[in-house]
């Protein structure tokens, strides 16, 4: 893990860290200053004082290993035990460009230890004395790998990447307490100190938050005798947390989460680490072309907004005269939501389609307003976002060492176990705008091969529901959306497809197919008829009719969904095909919670007091009365009136309906999305470990939900694409009886023209 900097707020970027180092290392007459105006000297003096005061009591419990013999001896103890905990301390969150300040170690039978490696004087930048050379730690880690030492870590991917990029050694994680914590409970904080305090009966003073204390100060600047007091405790915490987790994942008989942890989450750590280290190339020339194009487009779209506003020049002037304290600028600030709201609602007299946002100016509201000004604003914002988020941003975040984009992939990015990515978010690159994705390409001489699971989630739905008709359709190679549309709309199968047999477009067929796709995805994502109707641009009644027809055609789907909800209400969780749990405690909430306010009626009897009475509670008859009233209400306004009346009587009522409904919507989706995520991860593990793909110089680069993107030499593209799809399809066979299908495409750039191979 990133040690000192691992838990910093979003400020901790490479750019900010580099700037802090640059400011602190300049030779100036006065002591340099950092964020907040305080000098580095003052900040480090504060850090030393606070750490020594709070953690000085641990000085005798930790070892500071500053000579080679001590380091060799400690690693010998680890190898003899066969296991050990390790943590790295660095000066930034980028494993490629960071400086390795030191390593923290722990093995039972020894004190926790800190090995300083690259601490420097914050004044001169000179390496501090009595530190251990990289070669010594590298040699010891290599020996540990040869002895197959089981390493215990927290956020193992980071430490593996640091050891590889800074020492040239790939350590093999055996237990990652961060991932184990996610498998045990995805709904809580997974910071090491939070978990240790909660589960390991920690006696430490965890009230001290170090993030703010160290903010902006590279750990390499911290004096060694202070730094080790902060750092050396982490591997002990990691070890103790591992022991707790191991007990619950094994002895407490949790086969599902344990299987997911040991067979999916742990094996995929090296896969993700390799993806992040490899990075992806950016076509800087093409990015510059796009920047020029979209900057010109943004000017045109900005001009269009003012052309539309000129149509209402007299109305705008009239508003200004009647509102002498108005905030409208000249010209009107199109980036100001307050000014745009004045134009839309006060000057043009429009009514917001969202009652909860009567003066909203967001994308969803502008879309539904559907006026010339709202459309012009949407077009302008679209271009501005493409420029600021992608086109102009990407060239500025290329890694200075590699010249590539190296994003971070988060294995438990979603509570369902689905990946997410950040810095940058490669999963959020627009798919509808192919130009943006075309900025990313393979290395010179390499091509990109993208392969995605076709209809991964509907196939998973067919398997989980055990609907024979849906399963058979996939076995027969049918387009499931067109096939279901045939059943619902009572028209031939070919009339429900986007293209006719002769290759010509079929608009009506596409409409039928798209409507069914929206329904199936809506069902899987817990959307109601109203939400589906908005997506299909039809009435709620019409959408509900189609949904009912779907359930009539596939009754086992409805039966399975009902059973999922019933089991969730009973047990508080749902489970994927591979055993990953998604805990949804809100499903089990009472519809209403009653709390006695001061002076309210209760069952407490002060004249007949005994200990068994406990705290005062709302009288059951009062609870029954208000529950009956609430159940009879129609809409939120009536319910709010009843709750207000109860409050006047000294009773606070909490309506849990929203929380319950939200949790219920997640039940089916968590199983489908979680199972699909497990499937994709197993496919990635198989691809990464495949010896033939290694021989063909194939490297995983990106993962975007149901799609993986690799690169390989162009000459190997045909065999790689065939091998890739075979491995992906095979990854599902262990648990999913519905045949999976994968479509592979070879291109020079992401979403580029397909190459013949």
Located regions from the model:
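Short, low-order "capping/linker" segments at domain edges
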Residues: 750-757
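Acidic beta-strand-to-loop metal/phosphate-binding motif
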Residues: 85, 148-156, 448-450
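Structural signature of nuclease core domains in nucleic-acid processing machines
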Residues: 97-149, 155, 160-177, 704, ...
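C-terminal structured "cap/appendage" subdomains that terminate the fold
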Residues: 690-746
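Conserved beta-strand -> loop -> alpha-helix junction used to position metal-binding or nucleic-acid-contacting
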Residues: 169-194, 477-481
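Feature representing long, continuous alpha-helical segments
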Residues: 434, 458-459, 463, 482-483, ...
């Amino acid at each position: 893990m990133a040690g000192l900097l691992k838990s910093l707020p979003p400020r901790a970027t490479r750019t900010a860290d580099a700037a802090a180092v640059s400011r602190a290392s300049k030779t100036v007459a006065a002591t340099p200053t950092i964020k907040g105006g305080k000098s580095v000297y003052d900040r480090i003096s504060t850090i030393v004082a606070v750490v020594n005061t709070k953690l000085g009591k641990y000085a005798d419990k930790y070892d500071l290993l500053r000579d080679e013999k001590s380091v060799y001896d400690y690693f010998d103890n680890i190898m003899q035990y066969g296991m050990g905990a390790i943590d790295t301390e660095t000066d930034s969150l980028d494993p490629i460009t960071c400086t390795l300040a030191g390593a923290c170690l722990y093995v039972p039978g020894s004190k926790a230890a800190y090995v300083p490696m690259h601490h420097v004087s914050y004044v001169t930048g000179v390496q501090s004395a009595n530190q251990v050379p990289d070669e010594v730690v590298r040699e010891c880690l290599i020996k540990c790998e040869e002895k197959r030492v089981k390493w215990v870590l927290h956020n193992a991917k980071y430490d593996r990447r640091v050891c590889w990029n800074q020492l040239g050694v790939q350590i093999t994680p055996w237990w990652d307490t961060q991932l184990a914590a996610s498998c045990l409970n995805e709904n809580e904080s997974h910071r090491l100190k939070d978990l240790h305090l909660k589960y390991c009966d920690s006696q430490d003073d965890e009230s001290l938050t170090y993030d703010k204390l160290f903010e902006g100060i590279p750990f390499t600047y911290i004096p060694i005798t202070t730094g080790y007091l902060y750092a050396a405790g982490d591997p002990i915490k990691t070890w103790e947390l591992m022991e707790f987790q191991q007990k619950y994942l094994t002895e407490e008989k949790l086969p599902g989460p344990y299987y997911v942890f040991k067979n999916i989450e742990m094996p995929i750590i090296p896969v993700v680490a390799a993806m992040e280290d490899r990075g992806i190339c950016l076509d800087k020339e093409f990015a510059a072309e796009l920047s020029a194009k979209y900057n010109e487009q943004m000017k045109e779209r900005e001009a269009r907004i003012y052309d539309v506003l000129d149509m209402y020049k007299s109305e705008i002037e009239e508003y200004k005269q009647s509102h002498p304290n108005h905030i409208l600028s000249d010209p009107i600030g199109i980036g100001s939501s307050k000014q745009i709201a004045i134009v839309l609602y006060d000057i043009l007299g429009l009514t917001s389609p969202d009652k909860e946002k009567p003066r909203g100016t967001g994308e969803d509201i502008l879309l539904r307003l559907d006026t010339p000004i709202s459309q012009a604003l949407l077009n302008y914002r679209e271009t501005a976002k493409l420029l600021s988020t992608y086109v102009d941003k990407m060239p500025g975040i290329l890694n200075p060492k590699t010249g590539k984009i190296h994003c971070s992939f988060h294995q438990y990015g979603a509570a369902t176990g689905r990946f997410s990515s950040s810095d940058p978010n490669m999963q959020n690159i627009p798919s509808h705008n192919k130009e943006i994705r075309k900025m990313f390409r393979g290395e010179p001489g390499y091509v990109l091969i993208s392969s995605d699971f076709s209809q991964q989630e509907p196939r998973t739905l067919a398997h989980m529901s055990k609907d024979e008709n849906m399963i058979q359709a996939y076995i027969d190679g049918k387009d499931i959306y067109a096939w279901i549309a045939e059943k619902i709309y009572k028209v031939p199968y070919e009339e429900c497809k986007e293209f006719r047999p002769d290759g010509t477009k079929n608009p009506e067929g596409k409409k039928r197919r798209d409507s069914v796709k929206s329904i199936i995805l809506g069902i899987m994502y817990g959307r109601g008829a109203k939400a589906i109707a908005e997506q299909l641009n039809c009435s709620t009644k019409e959408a509900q009719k189609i949904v009912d027809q779907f359930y009539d055609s596939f009754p086992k789907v409805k039966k399975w969904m009902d059973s999922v909800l019933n089991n969730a209400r009973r047990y508080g969780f749902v489970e994927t095909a591979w055993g990953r749990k998604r805990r949804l405690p809100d499903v089990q909430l009472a519809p209403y919670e009653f709390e006695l306010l001061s002076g309210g009626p209760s069952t407490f009897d002060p004249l007949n007091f005994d200990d068994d009475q406990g705290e005062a509670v709302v009288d059951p008859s009062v609870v029954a009365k208000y529950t009956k009233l609430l159940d009879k209400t129609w809409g939120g306004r009536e319910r709010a009136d009843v709750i207000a009346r109860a409050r006047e009587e000294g009773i606070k009522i909490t309506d849990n309906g929203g929380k319950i409904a939200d949790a219920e919507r997640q039940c089916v989706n968590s199983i489908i999305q979680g199972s699909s995520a497990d499937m994709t991860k197993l496919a990635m593990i198989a691809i990464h470990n495949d010896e033939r793909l290694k021989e063909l110089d194939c490297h995983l680069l990106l993962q975007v939900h149901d799609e993986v993107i690799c690169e390989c030499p162009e000459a190997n593209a045909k065999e790689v694409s065939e091998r890739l799809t075979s491995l992906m399809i095979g990854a599902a066979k262990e648990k999913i009886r519905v045949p999976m299908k994968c479509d592979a495409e070879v291109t020079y750039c992401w979403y580029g023209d397909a190459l013949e191979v």
